C-alpha cells in the first residue's frame, strides 16, 4: 500500500444506563454536531466512526424514532463524509433492557439492526458492537458496568448471551447490506512478564485477548488453551461452537495502558516499562486474522502537546507496519473532541471533562484548538509522522511513557507551547483509572 494513511474521525457516545445520559450529551455534541463535523471536515477528514444511539432511538420496545439519526446521517451523506456507523458502543442499549444478560437482548438487537439496515440501505460501513472483549470484561468479569457480574462465570454469562446475538446480526447485515463492510473493532493488547509466575500469566493474558474474536469467527478453539479451558469450566462450552460471524476490516484499539507487565497474577503494571512497538502488536493481530486493519481508537490522557506526541508515535508505527506489508487502511484518534466522565470509567455522571480529544473542551464546553489540533490537521492532510512535532512530555504522561522513549529517541524534541504547559499536578495519577463509585 502507498500514500498517506487516511484519517477517520470519531465521537465518544457511551450510554450510562444508571444515569440515563450518554457522552454525546455530556460533551454537548448532540447540540453542536454540525459545528463538530465542520471542524472534522476542515481538518481534511472524510470518514467518521459515528454513533447510532439505540438507547434514544428505541425508547419503547419496537418503536423507533429515527428523526435525529436522519438529520445527522443525511448531513454526512450530503457533505461527502462516509460514516462508519457504530450501532452499539459499550453499554449503549435501551434502558428497558436489563443489561447484557437480559434474554431479550438478542432478539432486540436483531430487530434494531434490521430496522437500521432497511432505513439506510446506502450505508457503506458499520460496526455492530464496539470492543466486545473489553465490554465483557467490564460488565461480566470486573463488575464495573451493568449487570455488574464478577469472575469468569460472569464473563461467560455475558458472552453466552451477547456473542450469538452478534454473530446472528452479522450474518443478517450481510444479507441486508451486501456491499457494506463490517468494521469489527476490538482492543489491541500485549502482555510481558518477569519471573516464572509473571511470564505464565502474561502468556495467559496474551491468549485471552484473542478469545472473543476467535469465537465470533467460529474458529476451532483448542480446549487446552489456558483461557479456553477456563471458559469451558465456567460453563462456556457453547461459545466454542458458534455459527460464524463475518468481519471485513479489523479495527485495533491501542492505548498505552493496553500494554501490561506482570510480576505475578494480580501483580501487574501498566503502562508497561518495556513495551513492544505498536507496529509489532499490529503484526500479531494481522498474522492471526489476515484482515485489513485500521487503528480503531487511540489517545493519551494529558496535555494537548502530549497528545500531539502520541499522535506522532502511533502514526509512525502505522507507517512502519504498512511499509512492512501490513494492510493498514485507516487511523482513528478517538475521540475528536474531549470525552467526559471516564475518570470514573463512567461510574459517575458529573460532566467531568476527560482530556483526550483533538479539540479540548473548556468550562463552557466550547471547542478549543491547540498544538494537537494543528498536528492532527497536518497528518490528516497527508503529512507523514516525520513532519509532526515531538513535544517534551509533561507529567504524568512523561512517567507513563518512560518505556516508550527508546522507540522515540530518533526524534528532534521541542518544548511544549508555553500556553500548554501544565501547572503542578499530582504525578501519582495512574494511567489505568481506578473505579470511583458514587458517594466514595
For each of these PLM feature ranges, what is it?
Residues 31-53, 243-245, 249:
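Catalytic domains of carbohydrate-active enzymes, especially glycoside hydrolases
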Residues 21, 60-64, 97-100, 305-308:
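Short, solvent-exposed loop/turn segments at secondary-structure boundaries
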Residues 10, 26-28, 34-36, 47, ...:
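Glycan-recognition patch characteristic of GH18 chitinases/ENGases
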Residues 18-31, 103:
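Active-site mouth loops of central-metabolism enzymes
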Residues 3-18, 24, 38, 47-48:
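N-terminal regions that are enriched for targeting/export leaders
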Residues 43-69, 85-88:
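Aromatic-lined carbohydrate-binding/catalytic grooves of carbohydrate-active enzymes
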Residues 311:
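Surface-exposed substrate-engagement region within the catalytic domains
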Residues 2-8, 70-306, 316-439:
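Active-site region of glycoside hydrolase catalytic domains
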Amino acid at each position: 500500500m502507498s500514500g498517506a494513511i487516511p484519517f477517520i474521525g470519531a465521537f465518544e457516545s457511551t450510554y450510562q444506563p444508571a444515569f440515563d445520559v450518554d457522552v454525546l450529551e455530556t460533551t454537548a455534541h448532540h447540540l453542536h454536531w454540525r459545528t463538530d463535523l465542520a471542524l472534522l471536515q476542515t481538518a481534511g477528514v472524510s470518514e467518521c466512526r459515528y454513533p447510532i444511539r439505540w438507547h434514544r432511538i428505541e425508547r419503547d420496545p419496537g418503536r423507533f424514532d429515527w428523526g435525529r439519526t436522519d438529520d445527522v446521517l443525511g448531513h454526512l451523506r450530503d457533505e461527502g463524509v462516509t460514516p462508519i456507523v457504530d450501532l452499539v458502543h459499550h453499554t449503549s442499549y435501551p434502558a428497558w433492557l436489563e443489561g447484557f444478560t437480559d434474554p431479550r437482548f438478542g432478539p432486540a438487537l436483531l430487530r434494531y439492526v434490521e430496522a437500521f439496515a432497511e432505513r439506510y440501505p446506502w450505508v457503506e460501513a458499520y460496526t455492530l458492537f464496539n470492543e466486545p472483549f473489553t465490554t465483557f470484561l467490564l460488565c461480566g468479569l470486573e463488575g464495573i458496568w451493568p449487570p455488574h457480574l464478577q469472575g469468569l462465570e460472569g464473563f461467560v454469562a455475558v458472552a453466552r448471551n451477547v456473542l450469538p446475538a452478534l454473530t446472528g446480526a452479522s450474518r443478517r447485515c450481510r444479507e441486508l447490506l451486501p456491499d457494506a463492510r463490517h468494521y469489527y473493532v476490538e482492543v489491541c493488547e500485549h502482555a510481558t512478564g518477569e519471573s516464572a509466575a509473571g511470564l505464565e500469566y502474561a502468556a495467559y493474558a496474551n491468549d485471552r485477548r484473542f478469545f472473543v474474536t476467535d469465537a465470533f469467527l467460529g474458529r476451532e478453539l483448542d480446549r487446552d488453551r489456558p483461557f479456553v479451558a477456563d471458559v469451558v469450566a465456567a460453563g462456556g462450552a457453547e461459545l466454542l461452537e458458534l455459527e460464524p460471524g463475518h468481519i471485513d476490516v479489523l479495527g485495533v484499539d491501542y492505548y498505552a495502558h493496553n500494554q501490561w507487565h506482570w510480576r505475578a497474577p494480580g501483580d501487574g503494571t501498566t503502562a508497561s516499562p518495556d513495551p513492544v512497538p505498536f507496529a509489532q502488536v499490529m503484526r500479531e493481530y494481522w498474522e492471526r486474522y489476515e484482515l485489513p486493519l485500521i487503528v480503531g481508537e487511540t489517545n493519551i490522557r494529558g496535555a494537548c502537546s502530549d497528545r500531539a506526541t502520541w499522535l506522532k508515535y502511533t502514526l509512525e508505527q502505522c507507517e512502519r507496519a504498512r511499509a512492512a506489508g501490513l494492510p493498514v487502511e485507516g487511523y482513528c484518534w478517538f475521540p475528536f473532541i474531549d470525552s467526559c466522565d471516564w475518570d470514573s470509567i463512567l461510574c459517575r455522571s458529573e460532566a467531568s471533562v476527560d482530556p483526550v480529544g483533538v479539540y479540548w473542551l473548556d468550562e463552557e464546553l466550547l471547542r478549543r484548538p491547540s498544538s494537537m489540533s494543528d498536528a492532527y490537521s497536518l497528518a490528516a492532510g497527508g503529512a507523514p509522522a516525520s513532519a509532526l512535532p515531538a513535544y517534551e512530555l509533561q507529567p504524568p504522561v512523561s512517567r507513563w511513557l518512560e518505556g516508550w522513549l527508546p522507540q522515540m529517541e530518533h526524534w528532534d524534541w521541542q518544548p511544549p507551547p508555553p500556553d500548554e504547559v501544565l501547572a503542578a499536578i499530582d504525578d501519582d495519577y495512574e494511567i489505568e483509572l481506578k473505579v470511583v463509585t458514587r458517594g466514595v
